[in-house]
Amino acid sequence: MPENPAAEKMQVLQVLDRLRGKLQEKGDTTQNEKLSAFYETLKSPLFNQILTLQQSIKQLKGQLSHIPSDCSANFDFSRKGLLVFTDGSITNGNAHRPCSSITASESLPWTQRSGNEDFTSVIQQMAQGRHIEYIDIERPSTGGLGFSVVALRSQSLGLIDIFVKEVHPGSVADRDQRLKENDQILAINDTPLDQNISHQQAIALLQQATGSLRLVVAREVGHTQSRTSTSSADTTLPETVRWGHTEDVELINDGSGLGFGIVGGKSSGVVVRTIVPGGLADRDGRLQTGDHILKIGSTNVQGMTSEQVAQVLRNCGNSVRMLVARDPVGEIAVTPPTPASLPVALPVVATRTLGSDSSPFETYNVELVKKDGQSLGIRIVGYVGTAHPGEASGIYVKSIIPGSAAYHNGQIQVNDKIVAVDGVNIQGFANQDVVEVLRNAGQVVHLTLVRRKTSLSASPFEQPSSREAVAEPPEVPELTGSLKPETNSRMEAEEIGERLDNLRKDTVQALEKPDVYPEDIPGCPENELKSRWENLLGPDYEVMVATLDTQIADDEELQKYSKLLPIHTLRLGMEVDSFDGHHYISSIAPGGPVDTLNLLQPEDELLEVNGVQLYGKSRREAVSFLKEVPPPFTLVCCRRLFDDEASVDEPRTVEPSLLEAEVDRSVDVSTEDDDGELALWSPEVKTVELVKDCKGLGFSILDYQDPLDPMRSVIVIRSLVADGVAERSGELLPGDRLVSVNEFSLDNATLAEAVEVLKAVPPGVVHLGICKPLVEEEKEEKEEHFIFHSNNNGDNSESPETVHEIHSSLILEAPQGFRDEPYLEELVDEPFLDLGKSLQFQQKDMDSSSEAWEMHEFLSPRLERRGEEREMLVDEEYEIYQDRLRDMEAHPPPPHIREPTSASPRLDLQAGPQWLHADLSGGEILECHDTESMMTAYPQEMQDYSFSTTDMMKETFGLDSRPPMPSSEGNGQHGRFDDLEHLHSLVSHGLDLGMMTPSDLQGPGVLVDLPAVTQRREQEELPLYRLPSARVVTKPSSHVGMVSSRHANAACELPEREEGEGEETPNFSHWGPPRIVEIFREPNVSLGISIVGGQTVIKRLKNGEELKGIFIKQVLEDSPAGKTKALKTGDKILEVSGVDLQNASHAEAVEAIKSAGNPVVFVVQSLSSTPRVIPSVNNKGKTPPQNQDQNTQEKKAKRHGTAPPPMKLPPPYRAPSADTEESEEDSALTDKKIRQRYADLPGELHIIELEKDKNGLGLSLAGNKDRSRMSIFVVGINPDGPAAADGRMRVGDELLEINNQILYGRSHQNASAIIKTAPTRVKLVFIRNEDAVNQMAVAPFPVPSHSPSPVEDLGGTEPVSSEEDSSVDAKPLPERESSKPEDLTQAVDDSMVAEQEKASESPDSAARQMKQPGYSAQVSSSSQEIPSAPAPLCQSTHADVTGSGNFQAPLSVDPAPLSVDPATCPIVPGQEMIIEISKGRSGLGLSIVGGKDTPLDAIVIHEVYEEGAAARDGRLWAGDQILEVNGVDLRSSSHEEAITALRQTPQKVRLVIYRDEAQYRDEENLEVFLVDLQKKTGRGLGLSIVGKRSGSGVFISDIVKGGAADLDGRLIRGDQILSVNGEDVRQASQETVATILKCVQGLVQLEIGRLRAGSWASSRKTSQNSQGDQHSAHSSCRPSFAPVITSLQNLVGTKRSSDPPQKCTEEEPRTVEIIRELSDALGVSIAGGKGSPLGDIPIFIAMIQANGVAARTQKLKVGDRIVSINGQPLDGLSHTDAVNLLKNAFGRIILQVVADTNISAIATQLEMMSAGSQLGSPTADRHPQDPEELLQRTAD
């Protein structure tokens, strides 16, 4: 049996993990099942109990040998397996006394009786000449022995000795009169406490002793007459009260709580009211209900309220020591404790000299007089509590302010310890409490200070081992127990790290044997470590050395927090965050090993573990080391001392950013700004003056979690109200941090508080303290991370009723009309829902302010998860891409942008055109605000151009120094669009109209024309298209803007294109020449155009440019404008009948068009497809600014209607300081530092610089095959790219840094954001290792030279760049894809597939997938927790793609599909069917899931969109498997290859489809399990949900990293939520489930359904389960079944006519017996019957499901005619009657069947035509018109 089962078990689990990882790397999955079973067995609670029980039995053997023969050994085992000793005579609630865990593996050594000479010699040796006394104490039937002990380190070899700390008055020991304080216990029950007995074992011996307790103690000869109590000063009760019994109770909190409740108050005292059964107090057995609590630790709690006592208990840490009393005699009259005002005496530190009364300290009193309201002028820093055993605890003077009272006094020195203020002893006070005491002191302040004498003077920060306390008289040294705490959460009577140094006010008799501290022992390893690090770090840091030996006998200590932390922290009980070589404790698990020390705390830096320095190592190295290092652990940590620093008598005006920056610098002091990684704002506070008017200040705010301190949030400017006070001032920008309003500091203020402060400010001048975002070259690479979002969106911790109240205040002092309607939030953790819903505006709102909410599309994927726990990201039934959802969440709309209430009618997409005509044709449709909204589902051509009405949609949010999409970088890659009418899909998926250029900072106006670029997201990797911007002349502005996208989702309602599908897309690049269009008005008919835009800015670029103008949003076909065929969506209107509109407002444009005569003459510009000259790469960064005079002249000429000339391509984005070159010396130093940083890594380190071209670096990247390791490998190099031209990079190189930003060991999110935001000149640090090829998640492949590929990410990491591949048509994306299992949902629309969550998907990567055989990708990282074996990489050779897009299909080895008319043939379940679908004017309208690289292992239709061609065709259903597409075999293809094949389909699509016989699953084909998540206050569940567009079912679409679901680890994307807290949500809508999840609190139990992995295959023999949803399968389409019925009837008729009537086709009837339970599915489908669509043919078996009970008999066959059921003949029965018979048949079912050859032939051709109408589910609830319902029913 192992000595420490818990530790041994953890080691075995780690070995298993490593073994599994190595097998996975080798691709060996043969042992997965065995290893998984072994792993689960080790982790099971039963196994843990067995281990605990074994340990307890071993302990029992050791304990029984020490129980006196005259005492009975009553013991038991708890439910956890712990050994519990009980005394049969114990009564009155004291029957349970758990045995403390004895960590030594061997049993306690047997020793001889006291008469033995060996025993006597041992005792004499231990006594060292002191007086020895033998004491027998009889344990009473109730209560304890009446004394407490403390463990102190002895002077001999550093051993631990046990001393009597206190003898309680009136106790057994006190009445015996022999046991004295400070006695050293040498033996307990004849067991000497030598080096073989640990202090835990000694404590256990005292606790477990029954009957007589025999003690051998040693006592100093001169101190045998010591006081009996040391606490009389604090515990003396009024003379009117006498207690019958007092007891000292110590409880060691194991993380589950103390287990008792209190009640009472100041007058009556605090009384124990309840004791929780099975809780800690109950198990301890000493505390009883009705006990009065007199003291807690050294704090007298008499006279306190119950709440104050509760607070004292909470502050005690793990060890809680209480003095309780019961059985009062006389009247209880408790008086509150008075402040100690006794003279302050000199504390005496124990020395090795016996009887020494000398003191190294001197004390003195100082009187300070505050003058003219000044402060005292001292800064203090505190060590408070027992968090620093052995350290100099107390309040010290940190610094003295020159010119202050303390400065002029001259007596106070830095490092003086303050022990009293105005006679009030402040020892033990918290730092902030001392500050308050000093502030509240009068004009004259008396301070009592302690200072080391000159000869011994040293900084307390350098020698924190000094232990002082106020003592009286001075010459009496104090007994203080300073120990290195050992981890054992079941020590019940031991004093660990006593609080005597700062809490005790009583006097303690001295030991003549002095205290010895670890720090005082010259050879102590802890002291050496501490000294070494203190010398390295200097006096500003406190160094702590802790030793952990995680020998936890009860393994539940680990279990209770094992799910919260990674494996490497299980043994330590803490998690570590790493930043640039520093490793900080980010969280400590309650009850874990580190927590029990009560020494370390979050933000402490981990310097060294077991002699190995972690400082300077990467996170990967540190984590790897922590996984492997064996216990015991010696941890060296440091803490910056002035974290708690405060200025006395002065407000805390020090900006938190300063302290945070200092914390981040930690140890590394260099010229490099190491703290810049998280420092978002400048520490400099700028004061901005705004004049508040009746409309308010004109900006909105949000709260944002401070990345430097997860426990606090900061207030950030979210957006500016158009033409508001803030915008007009020009000094306030979105992204600025708001730190103060007038004199009120917003530091640590909540969002609601900040709103109230801003609201309460009276009109007039308002002074705002603002911190600007940092803009530095080092930070440019990570600027995209710092897009702000709120950690508390107001709804996390609020009830649903209050959510809208908080959000409605985000816009401050908006005009009254904006606040008329309540802001209704229907989302969970998200402030809005469906962008396609109509908006409700009031006309006055639109005119009075053009403030409008707009979505910020470009949130960094890394930041979306950092510090956030998002519960639901729900966009009603529309599935907006998740990166967009997070954007929406981060930037809630102002309250006046209202979502319609739940009662508002939702306009169906199909009704869009009718609604528009009805709403707009009655008047001038140009009055956009007269309509209820221009946002509902417009006709396709109206949606396509997504510049919204500016009054409604002006984007105002942006960040000053953070490019919205830095990945575009102005590289000039042209977007290709079919038409501007497809721009709607681009807006939905990430628009950016510009990027910053160096010239943007110079000159008042810059002409900018921006290319279309693609944006890709981490995880989702959705192709996101950028809009080619309208050419406008912009005016300078410092605001950042985002493209208006409120229309985005409505614009993307239809997944198909209505016109021009499959056309070659022209390469639009710039505005063409102006042209004149005349439109003749018709009576009572509107012109038929709608416009968008105006004088307000549609788009603000990062450099301050503004895009504005009037654009055509939609042209109605049958209108006068539509008939001209000269205007189209996206055209810019320059002039109307002589009125220049280039700088006109929206209202002016509307009026101009209204007032124009007949005809109306428009001067418009359209985007031109003329090729544009692209500047050379070398000139990109150095494009001179536009001539300012020229720009000014052009700007002046605008009002004369002249069209601007075609724009040139802007230079690539550069950081403002990018032109500043590092000196050679600095560069050399940096390179040297980099080489030192990675010196320990195997391989050859390279540092190179590359210049990106228009296509990026020309690299393809992938992650590590082992998902637990974060790597970024080069898997492909484009021969035409910069990397290939440079020649120094090779395939297999691992990127470590880019532009001084560390990628090594960082998450994919971090790496992606850094890579994407890199400027043009890129400095790369990479390492070359021969073994890298074996670690790469994707096999290396060459990048075709004709493909201008950027840096691309293939293995779950982000793409480095995201420019389009010009060889791929950038088709418009559909708005929706469904998130289904394995986060691989795709929407097949037209010739493209929109991907939601699969990694590595964008036009350029799609092209590469088509061109490169062998390409595969990992499943995104959110699926790491899938319990099944990882999907192997797809190694098959995929279909080659020719330049024209035609595929060479590999030969199929599957059986030949049924060959019938593919245009009309039905899909026969169980057979491969060839079908053809003509797409017409729309796309296919499918979404797919699966692939060989996913657990689904097949390409499966997830949903059929009712607007698409597949739905019109009517044959494809959700759940059908696609085997081939136009000859391309998808049976063994990866997910991306299927996307590629479906994207390239021509007008007529030829598909090979397989419909599983058991496709429409019951839940038996789902793995159903329960998941319990704890929803904490203010936090969400950390998951996103999505509903099917048609049908029911809600699925998990995303797991937020760091959230509750992610930490639990069991949920994955695609899981279906079946119930929430027992409430069935299978049929519930997405909104309903979102509401339920939003409202639940506390423990949330989710019932989850997950498709069994590997249930799909490409043949009927192995395909048994289905991905298809049983409800959505029918609701997703309504097939046109006329051809089906016709073909079936023809088939039946042909068969009948071809068979000779005289020939008997029947065999003898067979009797089949089936036993069916109530929960069983029968598993057969039947067809035929009277009135059947096939005709009146006999009822026969059309399908047998493999998982049904019928199949188990193996006696039924497809085609068998059913003669009778349970004796009832079926002749003449209708199909429905037969179905009902089978439905209701349970128990023993007798079927008589006949093998009819005619029927068999029909059945063979049909091959079980449908599995849709399972009798186990209500068939009537589904579509009875479906052909499957008419032809056959399935009987369960």
Swiss-Prot record:
This is InaD-like protein. It holds the Pfam family L27_2. It is a peripheral membrane protein. Forms a ternary complex with PALS1 and CRB1. Component of a complex whose core is composed of ARHGAP17, AMOT, PALS1, INADL/PATJ and PARD3/PAR3. Forms a heterotrimeric complex composed of MMP5, LIN7B and PATJ; the N-terminal L27 domain of PALS1 interacts with the L27 domain of PATJ and the C-terminal L27 domain of PALS1 interacts with the L27 domain of LIN7B. Component of a complex composed of CRB3, PALS1 and PATJ. As part of the Crumbs complex; interacts with WWP1, the interaction is enhanced by AMOTL2 and facilitates WWP1 localization to the plasma membrane. Residues 1372-1383 have a biased composition (Basic and acidic residues). Residues 134-221, 248-328, 365-453, 555-641, 687-773, 1074-1166, 1245-1328, 1472-1555, 1568-1650, 1709-1795 form the PDZ domain. Abundantly expressed in germ cells, also expressed in testes and seminiferous tubules, with faint expression in Sertoli cells (at protein level). Residues 1219-1228 have a biased composition (Acidic residues). It is found in: Cell junction, Tight junction; Apical cell membrane; Cytoplasm, Perinuclear region. It comes from Rattus norvegicus (Rat). Residues 1-65 form the L27 domain. Residues 456-492, 1173-1232, 1341-1448, 1657-1678, 1813-1836 are annotated as: Disordered. PANTHER family: INAD-LIKE PROTEIN (PTHR19964:SF11), MULTIPLE PDZ DOMAIN PROTEIN (PTHR19964). Residues 1203-1214 have a biased composition (Pro residues). Residues 456-466, 1173-1191, 1415-1426, 1434-1448 have a biased composition (Polar residues). Signal peptide: none annotated. One of its GO terms (cellular component) is perinuclear region of cytoplasm. Its main location: other.
